[in-house]
């Protein structure tokens, strides 16, 4: 996926995780605003965006209700308290220096019963383990689980811990982008009582509600 495709990706597979009743939504790392545009068109939601790259943020501004160009981690962006029904973090938390602090901050921006919906790469993904164990490779790439711009790496349990230690209750934790195991890996998984099931997924989606 080239840079332009990356910022334009609509992420339609994430739509089903966004609560149907969410009327005010904040999309952090909104790219060119495609996911937010889909939410506005299909749900009639009010969608705000935050995008680090100014040129991309300017494109999103033509699609969303309000867009901030800047870094959510630095405190340069001021968001209203208790305003959003849902905050979206599609493949963005792993790029942050301190995602725990950002998630803790976002709790005050949510309305009662508001949720954070995120997708996070799975470092225990089958292809990563295969390269590491069999090929002795840990190779950073331009995209994917080992994107060279990722600062944090999570397993399924790590995703749960990330949210719980940041003051959230995990409502949904589900794998997406499933791969097929080779017969050898299926056999190994069976011998281990299916303890490798989580390695089928390149990402996990977490829906979490802020603790009161």
Show which residues each predicted segment covers.
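Hydrophobic/aromatic residues located in beta-strands of well-ordered beta-sheets
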Residues: 47, 116-118
């Amino acid at each position: 996926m080239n840079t332009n495709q990356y910022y334009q990706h609509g992420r339609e597979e994430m739509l089903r995780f966004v609560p149907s009743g969410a009327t005010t939504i904040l999309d952090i790392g909104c790219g060119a605003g495609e996911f937010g545009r889909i939410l506005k068109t299909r749900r009639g939601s009010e969608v705000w965006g935050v995008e680090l790259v100014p040129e991309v943020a300017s494109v999103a501004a033509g699609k969303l209700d309000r867009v901030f160009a800047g870094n959510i981690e630095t405190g340069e962006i001021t968001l209203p308290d208790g305003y959003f029904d849902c905050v979206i973090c599609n493949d963005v938390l792993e790029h942050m220096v301190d995602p725990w602090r950002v998630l803790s901050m976002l709790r005050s921006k949510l309305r009662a019963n508001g949720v954070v919906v995120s997708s996070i790469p799975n470092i225990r993904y089958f292809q990563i383990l295969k390269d590491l164990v069999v090929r002795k490779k840990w190779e950073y790439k331009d995209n994917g689980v080992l994107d060279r711009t990722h600062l944090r790496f999570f397993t399924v349990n790590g995703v749960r811990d990330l949210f719980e230690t940041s003051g959230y209750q995990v409502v949904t934790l589900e794998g997406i982008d499933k791969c097929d195991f080779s017969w050898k890996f299926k056999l190994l998984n069976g011998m281990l009582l299916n303890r490798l099931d989580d390695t089928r997924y390149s990402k996990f989606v977490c829906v979490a509600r802020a603790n009161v």
